[in-house]
């Protein structure tokens, strides 16, 4: 049965189904730190998550055979699992206690000051920037974030301070709870970076997504904060629909303004120079503005925030240089939506203005591979001299999409001598693309 059991007073045996995902693996980290005995099942276990779970002493069980399901006080069921899964059916038939990952996390952080970072783009980067600022001030912030940063050992930790930062996405919680994950977090500060249509596998249209954000806004207390950038009509429609918390429109009445041309942030009566920051592109600097203002609301001086971010190590797969030699550069980026692809392409063109750039875009998300973005998707990378579109799903949308990495590599091999920068964009395992390309470059 669905349980409301919290871990405030009990030390439990907890089994996580779907433990190898970033969220559930991060949840395992926090549960172990809280003193629980944790085990987990998944289809397969692979680094780096398998290494992280092993270091925590988590028993890992491959597959979902009913016979391999261990006894536990509580089962946490991941949103990738559905009815028909042997373990799920056994748990239901035996009326065992179960819950979702987001609900479990929400119960564990209920007594913390929660900063939830939501939106279609920039969640991971903004979350880590906030954590870097807090950590630089000696604040042992807790967090669970769906990415990897060299600034932190893991993508999750409990932390000892009052603050907890959570990457709050709008995907559903579990097969038995189709509400968005962020509805469970009850944030004190709710950041909405932007809202666009995505996740076509669970949302019919943009209004479906806006409804979930509206529900989340209704959970923010009257003394809480809702932060968003000026100019996003979708967010403004939500605020106008009903909001009971303090709102902060960055770039608007909050007197915090990003000037890309000047390379500065104007914050009230201060002028903050961004020239020494390691981030590239307006979208990343927007994340900086959001992180700095969030930190300001929680008592951190903007100059201290800026100083902390000058030492930022960034987030893996966010315009990350994965290879560089005398004449070739390979960049890996997580972009998987027309807006994100457009921003990443613009950043690459500005950063490598005199060099020939080609792009490889994998249509890996359901929304992309099923053609929901239409021509916007292909237009988003039109600034590049050449784009290779990789679609490994069974549904091809265009004749120029490659359904084989080997075929793509064969064509790239013909052009490689005339290429300076290769920009890979995918939200799946990009190493299957980057590693053979790097090998190709080395062997030329």
What are these regions (language model features)?
Residues 1-45, 54-61, 71, 75, ...:
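ATP-dependent carboxylate-amine ligase
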Residues 5-11, 30-36, 67-70, 83-228, ...:
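Phosphate-binding loop of NTP-binding sites
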Residues 43-46, 64-66, 79-83, 103, ...:
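Short, polar loop motifs at secondary-structure junctions
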Residues 61-64, 99-106, 144-147, 242-261, ...:
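Beta-strand->loop->alpha-helix junctions that form or flank phosphate-binding loops
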Residues 75-78, 166-167, 192, 228, ...:
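Redox-cofactor binding/interface segments in oxidoreductases and associated redox assembly factors
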Residues 80-82, 122, 170-173, 196-198, ...:
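Short glycine-rich anion-binding loops that position phosphate/pyrophosphate groups of nucleotides
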Residues 183-197, 236-237, 278-314:
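A conserved, hydrophobic alpha-helical segment in the catalytic core
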Residues 274-281, 328-332:
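Short pre-catalytic strand/loop immediately N-terminal to key active-site residues, enriched for Gly-Thr
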């Amino acid at each position: 049965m669905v349980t409301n059991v919290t871990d405030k007073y009990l030390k439990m045996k907890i089994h996580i189904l779907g433990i190898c995902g970033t969220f559930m693996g991060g949840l395992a980290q926090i549960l172990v730190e809280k003193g629980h005995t944790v085990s987990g099942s998944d289809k397969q276990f692979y680094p780096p998550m398998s290494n992280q779970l092993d270091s925590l002493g988590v028993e890992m069980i491959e597959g979902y055979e009913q016979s391999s399901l261990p006894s536990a006080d509580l089962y946490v069921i991941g949103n990738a699992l559905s009815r028909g899964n042997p373990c799920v059916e056994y748990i239901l038939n035996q009326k065992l206690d179960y819950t979702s990952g987001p609900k479990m996390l929400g119960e564990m952080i209920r007594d913390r000051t929660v900063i939830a970072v939501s939106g279609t783009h920039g969640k991971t980067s903004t979350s880590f920037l906030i954590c870097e600022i807090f950590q630089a001030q000696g604040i042992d912030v807790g967090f669970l974030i769906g990415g990897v940063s060299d600034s932190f050992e893991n993508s999750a930790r409990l932390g000892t301070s009052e603050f907890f930062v959570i990457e709050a996405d709008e995907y559903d919680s579990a097969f038995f709870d189709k509400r968005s994950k962020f509805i469970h977090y009850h944030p004190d500060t709710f950041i909405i970076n932007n809202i666009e249509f995505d996740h076509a596998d669970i949302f019919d249209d943009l209004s479906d997504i806006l409804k979930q954000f509206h529900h989340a806004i209704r959970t923010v207390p009257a003394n809480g904060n809702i932060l968003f950038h000026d100019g996003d009509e979708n967010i403004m429609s939500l605020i106008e629909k009903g909001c009971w918390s303090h709102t902060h429109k960055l770039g608007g009445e909050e007197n915090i303004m990003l000037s890309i041309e000047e390379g500065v942030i104007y914050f009230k009566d201060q002028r903050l120079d961004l020239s020494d920051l390691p981030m590239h592109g307006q979208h990343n600097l927007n994340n900086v503005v959001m992180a700095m203002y969030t930190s300001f609301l929680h008592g951190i001086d903007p100059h201290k925030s800026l100083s902390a971010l000058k030492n930022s190590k960034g987030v893996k797969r966010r315009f990350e240089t994965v290879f560089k030699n005398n004449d070739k550069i390979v960049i890996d980026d997580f972009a998987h939506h027309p807006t994100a692809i457009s921003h990443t392409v613009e950043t690459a063109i500005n950063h490598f203005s005199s060099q020939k750039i080609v792009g490889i875009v994998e249509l890996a998300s359901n929304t992309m591979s099923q053609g929901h973005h239409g021509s916007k998707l292909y237009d988003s990378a039109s600034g590049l001299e050449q784009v290779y579109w990789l679609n490994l799903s069974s549904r091809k949308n265009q004749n120029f999409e490659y359904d084989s990495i080997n075929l793509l590599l064969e064509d790239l091999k013909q052009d490689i001598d005339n290429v300076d920068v290769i920009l890979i964009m995918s939200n799946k395992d990009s190493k299957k693309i980057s590693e053979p390309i790097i090998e190709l470059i080395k062997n030329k």
